[in-house]
Amino acid sequence: MEYRVLPHGGEQVSVIGMGSSVIGAQPEKEIIATVRAAVDSGVNYFDMAGGHAAIFAAYGKALEGIRDKVYLQIHFGADYTSGEYGWTTELAEVKRSVAWQLEQLRTDYIDVGFLHCLDEESDLAAYQANGVPDYVRALKKQGVIRHIGLSSHTPALVNKVLDMGIVDVVMFSINPAYDYGQGDYGIGENTERYDLYRRCQREGVAITVMKPFCGGQLLDAAQSPFGVALTKEQCIQYALDKPGVMAVLPGFGNQREMREVLSFFDASAADRDYSCLGELAPAGASGRCVYCKHCHPCPAGLDVALINKYYDLAMQGDNLAREHYLTLEKRAGDCVGCGHCDSRCPFHVTQSQRMQTIQTYFGA
């Protein structure tokens, strides 16, 4: 397992966590066994937004004695008191549902408390009018919540909440389909979505990724908007390469599916490579570096993807990105203009020219 740090807190989080959207259909015994197997495999981050209320009691049993070794995302607005998933912005219902979730989970604290499913302006307005954000902030002040988060599919709404300055974690849907405007949740232009990822990294807001496989559609050529099937390894690597991403949270339906997802760590760089998207993505994606590293290795020793990432972040106002860039052993000024990267870039970025632009910007 690999781990990344939650910037506002310092927790070490597994880069692959576990979503709970599908496992609720399993018997309690299988849920408990899968959660424990995940923990034994190094998974320490779990999202609790699922379609079934049954997951909570099962998780409570599975995590007994090891609660302090894992991190739970709990959603304010997801209501399970009826036995099935429901959504509410009413404060009394939010309080009742969260209290029920904590009781079932056998815990008295929340690692990340999420404002749940803000996809429209009216959602945020309703939460605010009913005092839900104030309630979440009060619980954080009391120590019940350690971090405040937000789950959304809409970049504009995420930016609006980021402006409030209360969020440490954003749960957002990242996959090639959505980033290129395909699918029900492909909300926002490609540039708007990438700007959001960079803003999160710049401000130290961690992104946890939901729907990395686009609900399984990307794994099936017949359903994929690209007309070809991608692999789980490609989708996971795609998400992990995006600025600000801390963890990817695919749903495991059972232990077999968990092992399949975690085999990502045994996959070769070639197996994880998603540069085929350069030939599949819409024309609007052409000419932008997506940090896929298909141009690597550089004959002159440059980390072309990282140089591009630092430049893009600096252009968004991240002063730390400039400092990080200047500490690189090889910088854009070391480019010899051989054209190796230009010929290999599946997104048709003329990297040799871009290195000149970056050298001029940073002065090195």
Predicted regions and their residues:
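N-terminal binding-site loop/beta-alpha segment at the start of enzyme catalytic domains
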Residues: 1-74, 80, 108, 141
